[in-house]
Amino acid sequence: MLMPKRTKFRKQQRGRMNGAACRGNEIEFGTYALQALEPVWMTSRQIEAARRAMTRYIRRGGKIYIRVFPDKPVTQRAAETRMGSGKGAPEYWVCVVKPGRILFEIDGVAEEIAREAMRLAAAKLPIKSRFIVKSETAPAEEPTNAPT
């Protein structure tokens, strides 16, 4: 499962998840992608389950890009512990996902295969998501400053 090799601090505060993703919201590597539509803390187990579902479906064709990484430790106290006596030990790792964030990308397969692989992956995730295709729009010609 995914987790950082080392971190500067063992524990983090929870923080908030307001607003849409302002980075990581465009397709960069592949042709097809799965985009989150809701905010969530996505665990490393969920990311791994989705990756396995996609890999199993597309077999040896194509390439999968995982665009999220769980870098936030979540702590838990032991059950039936009295209040106080500090924060619990880190139990698992999560990735803070905001709406609009690209989760996975696929390249090198047909659209039907990519769509089905993403559907299987989305079933493993706790949020609504959508399948998107990279738009092949050519950049507009820039106006020249030459006098006419």
UniProtKB/Swiss-Prot annotation:
Family per similarity comment: Belongs to the universal ribosomal protein uL16 family.
The species this protein was found in: Gloeobacter violaceus (strain ATCC 29082 / PCC 7421)
Entry GO terms, CC: cytosolic large ribosomal subunit
UniProt protein name: Large ribosomal subunit protein uL16
Short name of one Pfam family: Ribosomal_L16
Molecular-function GO term, any one: structural constituent of ribosome
Lineage of origin: Bacteria, Bacillati, Cyanobacteriota, Cyanophyceae, Gloeobacterales
Record's signal peptide: none
Keywords from the UniProt entry: Ribonucleoprotein, Ribosomal protein, RNA-binding, rRNA-binding, tRNA-binding
Alphabetical GO biological process terms: translation
Domain of life according to the entry: Bacteria
HAMAP family: Ribosomal_uL16
Functional summary from the UniProt entry: Binds 23S rRNA and is also seen to make contacts with the A and possibly P site tRNAs.
PROSITE patterns with a match to the protein in the record: RIBOSOMAL_L16_1 (PS00586), RIBOSOMAL_L16_2 (PS00701)
Segments crossing the lipid bilayer: none
Subunit composition and interactions: Part of the 50S ribosomal subunit.
